[in-house]
Swiss-Prot record:
Record note on modification: Phosphorylated by MAP kinases.
Keywords (A to Z) from UniProt: Actin-binding, Allergen, Cytoplasm, Cytoskeleton, Disulfide bond, Phosphoprotein
GO molecular function, one term: actin monomer binding
Modified residues annotated as Phosphothreonine in this record: T114
GO CC annotation: cell cortex; cytoskeleton
Cystine pairs: C13-C118
InterPro entries, per the entry: PFN, PFN_euk, PFN_sf
UniProt name for this protein: Profilin-2
Assembly description: Occurs in many kinds of cells as a complex with monomeric actin in a 1:1 ratio.
Amino acid sequence: MLWQAYVDDHLMCDIEGHEGHRLTAAAIVGHDGSVWAQSATFPQFKPEEMNGVMTDFNEPGHLAPTGLHLGGTKYMVIQGEAGAVIRGKKGSGGITIKKTGQALVFGIYEEPVTPGQCNMVVERLGDYLLEQGL
């Protein structure tokens, strides 16, 4: 399977109805922290940062006191869906992470992309992967 095509064509694409608006960075990462595919702009993350994300999916609320860290950037964790979606905010941008059976789908955005648009793009691909048993 060509995971890079999913990142390029389904995550880093123009937002529907908003030509030129797209995520800042995106990736698909295995539960073990291995990168399956990523945009050129996706931050280099530390293993402990990915461990924190996985722990929060298994123990919702784990990241709330400390924030979500990715590539040295700290995001304030905002409402998500326990065990399924983590959302974070930093200034005028943020992050959405959708958990599938085998992977995590990451989307990072800055204005003019809205949190809702990022959620839609990331969760749509995540839901598709779940339907495919991935």
